[in-house]
Regions:
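Generic protein-terminus/edge-of-domain signal
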Residues: 2-95, 104
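N-terminal regulatory/effector-sensing and dimerization cores
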Residues: 61-162
């Protein structure tokens, strides 16, 4: 009987040790995989601007008639943190994305709002055309909009970033 208890204790300690090793390995991998983060300026450096895009001092207004052909969606294939406000209107097709931990389908005539620092991932794009306004936080501050006054609005947008029109 003592040997049975000893065997159970030995295997339980061994399993516990194996579990601790497994958890350390997983946590180590999670720590190594950091979420990519970039600003509007970096996004423009990577993707470039088209002649018809309007850009002024940290604010971009742009349209992409065929998102797949005109924009590098691979940047958002994995969770990414974009440090800019973005208001995106989908006029055609659809985009399936995840904002934070919530999955959204941004369909035709849908407005999507991204807050700075939120995590965004694009899963698929189906024949989408979009119109977008992207602004760095500093741009909003320079034009004297008091972000504290918009706290309630930001809380609602954070809960419901996608709005069918």
């Amino acid at each position: 009987m003592n040997s049975s208890i000893g065997s159970i204790l030995y295997y339980s300690m061994k399993s516990s040790r194996d579990l601790r090793i497994f958890v350390r390995i997983i946590i180590g991998k999670m720590n190594k995989k950091e979420i990519q983060s970039f600003s509007l300026a970096t996004l423009l450096d990577i993707c470039g601007r088209r002649p018809e895009d309007l850009y002024y001092d940290g604010c971009l207004i742009a349209s992409r008639v065929n998102v797949k052909d005109e924009f590098n969606i691979d940047l958002f294939r994995y969770p990414t943190r974009l440090n800019a406000f973005a208001i995106i209107f989908c006029s055609k097709g659809s985009i399936v994305s995840t904002s934070g931990v919530t999955r959204h389908t941004i369909g035709e005539r849908t407005l999507f709002v991204h807050l700075p620092g939120s995590i965004l991932q694009v899963e698929s794009v189906e024949d989408a055309s979009v119109h977008a306004i992207l602004c760095e936080e500093e741009f909003i501050q320079r034009i004297n909009i008091d972000l504290k006054l918009l706290t309630q609005l930001f809380l609602q947008v954070e809960k419901h970033p996608s709005l069918p029109l």
